[in-house]
């Protein structure tokens, strides 16, 4: 083993940079993690719900007293009647206040939890490795963020409020009914038990259909996003008919599953709503007979009817709340699959010391016997890769498509979860560096540039928190170095011109050059260029290469923009000024040396040199 050793760290050293929900397979524990952060608001809301229901069951008692008072027909009871009426009016006004308060103290935390889960989801998605996105389409992820989190918000807001409301109402109201007439209360409970036995069976079917619909919605969202992203390809290949048929198929599947949910609800909900009418008929029939037999007063019967009416909303709401909880819990399970994803160990490290720039200045970057196999692969795509990049060097990597160039770049950037002991920055194992330090030291321009729907200026200065302090003259120099100054000057609003979604208003070469200008804006230790010149002509390529090589030299009292450069390409013309060139084939270094040596040695490099020279001539 070389002197470059990985620094041993205990498991306790691996702490999250950002506080995330605890890892658990129990979705109720995860839900509780968010709810308990708003315990004070929920506690006040629960008290408000209790007060609301206490007032609701108190008013019928005064109605009973008032009716019985009227039934007695005594003139002396007029003052007492007015007292009862004023009490009922006061209770009604108080109930309006506490009921409104209960909604505020439940709904506000629900919205806050929705926001927090979205933030946690986004943080987690930003930290996950590239292979996660290869398995999960963006449309699927968008569906989880939009639809599934909405279901969780409904649980934490309206759902919890109604759960406490229903529990309290179904406790207080039957108690008051029992006080009036135990026998009549038992008659009312029997149909309730029968109805809810049937409803419970319907809810099981409802949950299964909701889970299936959510999966169907994710597939539909994924296909829609993919189709819109590839709209130019679909139009150019006359694939609109195929795309439309595929969308209709997914949409019909979504409709079929939604109809199953509607059918189940149409069976469950009417049973709950018709229960109210059945209870009223039952109370009038049996209670009326009790009044005739003088076992019950008219006031008591009126109060009992009022109590049975108070049972109506909780009983109907129980079906809605059960549906809401089932749908929300299905969404929470989907969210949990993202939040519980394992992070690479390096992403859990605190910031490393010493800083990366010092590490690179000492010994550069070294790759030692690097092997890599994709998680679902059956063979290594990189095998026994060894090389070193010293400060001030230009290293070239050349190879045909599928030779492992991009995988190597992703490994150097740690977009892939590499094994410790394979890549070192100075004396430090790259696998144990924090992302913050690594991205400061190593900057990459990819072969597939991504531009935001923003201005040219904001795309170049993306993620640069110190942009306001950048000299405008330096910004223009960067545009010139990226061969963009003349073209940007012709844009309608110069650098303030909007580039459209994913840079749709620009050519492929312009996109790559904006991405290159973004990397040139601030100094770094190692600048990696992954096939960034593939969409430009040879004349522009020569200009860009000259400007790229200038990044290694201090200029106008400014430090060098990069200490070393790694150029990855399939063009031999990009390798002419490199200090050392690696030739990759099938994941292995099959040849290496200087440009002047490789063009004289039989092999892939010489073949590509002759082929590209003939093409250019």
Model-found features: residue ranges?
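Cytosolic ends of transmembrane helices, especially the final helix of ABC transmembrane type-1 domains
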Residues: 216, 239, 263, 311-340
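Membrane-integrated ABC transporters
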Residues: 1-56, 71-87, 102-106, 110, ...
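Juxtamembrane loop-to-helix connectors within ABC transporter transmembrane domains
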Residues: 17, 23, 106-110, 126-171, ...
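An intracellular "coupling" helix at the cytosolic face of ABC transporter transmembrane type-1 domains
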Residues: 130-131, 147-156, 160, 164, ...
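Transmembrane helices of ABC transporter permease
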Residues: 37, 41-54, 58, 91, ...
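ABC-type nucleotide-binding domain
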Residues: 356-617
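Alpha-helical segments in transporter systems
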Residues: 40-65, 84, 88, 103-107, ...
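Hydrophobic alpha-helical segments in the permease module
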Residues: 87-99, 192-196, 200, 265-279, ...
């Amino acid at each position: 083993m070389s002197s470059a050793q990985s620094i041993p760290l205990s498991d306790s050293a691996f702490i999250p940079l950002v506080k995330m929900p605890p890892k658990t397979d129990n979705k109720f524990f995860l839900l509780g993690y968010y709810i308990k952060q708003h315990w004070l608001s929920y506690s006040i809301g629960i008290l408000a719900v209790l007060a609301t229901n206490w007032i609701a069951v108190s008013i019928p008692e005064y109605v009973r007293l008032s009716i019985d008072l009227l039934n007695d027909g005594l003139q002396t009871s007029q003052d007492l009647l007015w007292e009862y009426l004023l009490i009922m009016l006061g209770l009604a006004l108080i109930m309006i206040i506490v009921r409104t308060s209960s909604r505020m103290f439940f709904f506000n935390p629900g919205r806050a939890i929705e926001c927090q889960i979205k933030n946690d989801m986004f943080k987690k998605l930003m930290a996950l490795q590239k292979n996660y996105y290869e398995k999960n389409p963006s449309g699927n992820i968008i569906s989880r963020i939009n639809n599934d989190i909405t279901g969780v918000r409904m649980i934490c807001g309206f759902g919890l409020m109604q759960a406490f409301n229903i529990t309290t109402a179904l406790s207080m109201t039957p108690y008051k009914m029992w006080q009036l007439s135990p026998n009549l209360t038992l008659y009312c409970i029997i149909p309730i038990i029968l109805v809810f036995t049937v409803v419970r069976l319907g809810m099981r079917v409802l949950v299964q259909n909701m889970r299936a619909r959510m999966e169907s919605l994710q597939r539909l969202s994924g296909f829609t996003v993919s189709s819109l992203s590839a709209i130019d390809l679909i139009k150019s290949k006359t694939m609109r008919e195929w795309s439309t048929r595929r969308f209709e198929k997914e949409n019909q599947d979504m409709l079929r599953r939604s109809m199953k949910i509607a059918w189940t609800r149409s069976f469950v909900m009417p049973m709950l709503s018709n229960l109210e009418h059945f209870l009223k008929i039952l109370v009038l029939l049996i209670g009326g007979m009790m009044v005739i037999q003088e076992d019950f007063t008219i006031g008591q019967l009126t109060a009992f009817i009022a109590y049975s009416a108070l049972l109506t909303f909780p009983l109907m709401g129980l079906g809605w709340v059960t549906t809401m909880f089932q749908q929300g819990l299905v969404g929470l399970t989907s969210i949990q699959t993202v939040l519980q994803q394992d992070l690479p160990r390096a992403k859990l490290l605190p910031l490393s010391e010493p800083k990366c720039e010092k590490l690179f200045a000492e010994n550069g970057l070294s790759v030692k016997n690097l092997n890599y196999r994709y998680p679902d692969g059956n063979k290594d795509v990189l095998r026994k890769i060894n090389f070193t990049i010293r400060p001030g060097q230009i290293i070239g990597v050349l190879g045909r498509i599928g030779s492992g160039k991009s995988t190597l770049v992703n490994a150097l950037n740690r977009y892939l979860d590499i094994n410790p002991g394979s890549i070192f920055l100075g004396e430090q194992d790259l696998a144990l560096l924090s992302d913050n330090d690594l991205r400061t030291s190593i900057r990459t321009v990819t072969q597939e540039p991504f531009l935001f729907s923003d201005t040219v200026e904001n795309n170049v200065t993306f993620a640069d928190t110190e942009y306001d302090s950048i000299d405008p003259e330096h910004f223009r120099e960067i545009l010139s170095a990226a061969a963009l100054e003349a073209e940007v000057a012709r844009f309608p609003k110069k650098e303030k011109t909007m580039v459209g979604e994913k840079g749709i208003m620009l050519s492929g070469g312009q996109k790559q050059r904006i991405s290159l200008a973004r990397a040139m804006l601030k100094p770094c230790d190692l600048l990696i260029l992954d096939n960034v010149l593939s969409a430009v002509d040879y004349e522009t390529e020569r200009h860009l290469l000259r400007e790229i090589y200038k990044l290694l030299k201090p200029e106008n009292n400014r430090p060098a923009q990069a200490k070393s450069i790694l150029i990855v390409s399939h063009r031999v013309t990009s390798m002419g000024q490199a200090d050392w060139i690696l030739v990759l084939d099938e994941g292995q270094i099959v040849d290496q040396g200087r440009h002047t040596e490789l063009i004289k040695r039989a092999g892939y490099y010489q073949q590509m040199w002759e082929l590209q020279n003939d093409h250019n001539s």
